[in-house]
C-alpha cells in the first residue's frame, strides 16, 4: 500500500491511539497534587515516577513522527498550510466554546470580568495564546514547512546529514546535561528538529529491520528505567532528583526518541487494516484537545481524578490505569460526537468557507497565487 496518507494504515492509526493514552497517563501524574519524586521509593513509587514525564514525551513524539513521515514526501504550500490550520482552528473553537458554556453553567456567578475577557480571547485566538502548545507549534511548523522542505531537498544528502549531526550534538548529546535547555523544548524548534532527522531517514537511508526496531525500543526503555532506579537510590532530594532525571525523559531526548522511533517502525510495518481502529483513531487528537483544554484539565485532575485520593491505596496502580482508560474513552466519545455534529453542519462542504475566503483574498492580492 502506498504511504501517501490517503489510505490510513491501521498500524499507525493504532499507534495514534496508544500515543494519546500515553499523553493522558503523563498528565494524570504531572497535573496531580502529589510530588511523586518526594515519596518513599518502592515499586508503586517507581511506576508513578515513570509516568511523570516519559509517556507524555513519547506520545507527542509519536504524534509528530506519524505526521512528518507523510509530510516529508508531499508537496507543501502556504495555501495548504492555512487550510489545515483553518480546519484545526474550528476544533479548537468548539472545545473552547464547550468549556466556556460549562464554566457558565457550573459556576455562573464565579467568573470575573478579567477571567471572562481572557476566555473570549482564548475562544477566538487559541493558537496565538498557546492554549495547546502542541497545536500552536504544529501550526507554525506547517507555515514554515514549504521553505524548510525546499531547502532540505536543495541541500542534498551530504549537507543534510551534517545538519542532522549538528542538531544531534546540540540537542541529544548536550541535552543530557542536567539543566540544559539549548532553546529546544515545547516549541516549534523541536518540530523542525524531528522533521530534519526523519526526512533524512526517509529520503536517504534504508529502512531498519524489525529486530533493529525492537533493540532500539528496548535500549530506550532500559535507559529510562535504569536512570530512574539508580538516581532515586542515590539522590534523596526531590528537586535535585527531578533535575537529574529530566534530561533522560524530557521531550526530544535520546531515550525518548529511541523508544518513539522503535515503536513507529514496528507499527509502520503492520500490514493489516481495521475500519474500527481507523475510526477510533480519528478521535486521538480530540482526546488531547479535550483533556488539555485549561478548564476541562482543571476539572479532570483536581475534581474528577485526584491522585492523592488513591495514591496510598493497595491497588493504586490499578486505579490509575482504569482512570486513564476511562478518561480516554469518555473524551474519545465526546470527540466522536463533535465529529458527528461537524459532519451534519460545517463538514457538509468541508473547507468551503476557507476556499471562499482564500479566493476573495486572491482577487485582491495577486501575489497569493504563488502560495
Regions found by a protein language model. Name each.
Residues 1-371:
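Alpha-helical transmembrane segments and their immediate juxtamembrane cytosolic regions
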